[in-house]
């Protein structure tokens, strides 16, 4: 499963920029990878794990803006089409079950 976080946060004041940086840093610390600006994704073992991660994200939400989550199966995530640009080739972002180092 994949948990995708999509957000649009205001960055007009220095306090808003600080909240944006803190939120982004917390997402990265939770194991999320940026696939586009303001779109982050993380691999989760199952739906329960994804829902648990959603709850953890609720604990560090910024005070303003829009933050949405989307839980996807591996098949749904792999059906994503790149109309322009290239897929991120990062090991943590791989759908493969076995990784040989």
Swiss-Prot record:
Disulphide bridges in this chain?
none
Q: Which Pfam families match?
A: CRISPR_Cas2
Q: Could you tell me the Gene Ontology terms of the biological process aspect for this record? A: defense response to virus; maintenance of CRISPR repeat elements
What Gene Ontology molecular-function terms does this entry list?
metal ion binding; RNA endonuclease activity
Residues given in the record as Mg(2+) binding sites: 8
Keyword Nucleotide-binding: yes or no? Answer: no
Q: What is its EC number?
A: 3.1.-.-
Cofactor(s) essential for the protein: Mg(2+)
The record's section on InterPro entries has: CRISPR_associated_Cas2 (IPR021127), Virulence_VapD/CRISPR_Cas2 (IPR019199)
- Keyword vocabulary terms for this entry: Antiviral defense, Endonuclease, Hydrolase, Magnesium, Metal-binding, Nuclease
Functional summary from the UniProt entry: CRISPR (clustered regularly interspaced short palindromic repeat), is an adaptive immune system that provides protection against mobile genetic elements (viruses, transposable elements and conjugative plasmids). CRISPR clusters contain sequences complementary to antecedent mobile elements and target invading nucleic acids. CRISPR clusters are transcribed and processed into CRISPR RNA (crRNA). Functions as a ssRNA-specific endoribonuclease. Involved in the integration of spacer DNA into the CRISPR cassette.
- Return the similarity comment: Belongs to the CRISPR-associated endoribonuclease Cas2 protein family.
The UniProt subunit note reads as follows: Homodimer, forms a heterotetramer with a Cas1 homodimer.
What protein name does the entry list?
A: CRISPR-associated endoribonuclease Cas2
Q: Which organism was this protein described from?
A: Ligilactobacillus salivarius (strain UCC118)
From the UniProt record, report the name of the gene that encodes this protein: cas2
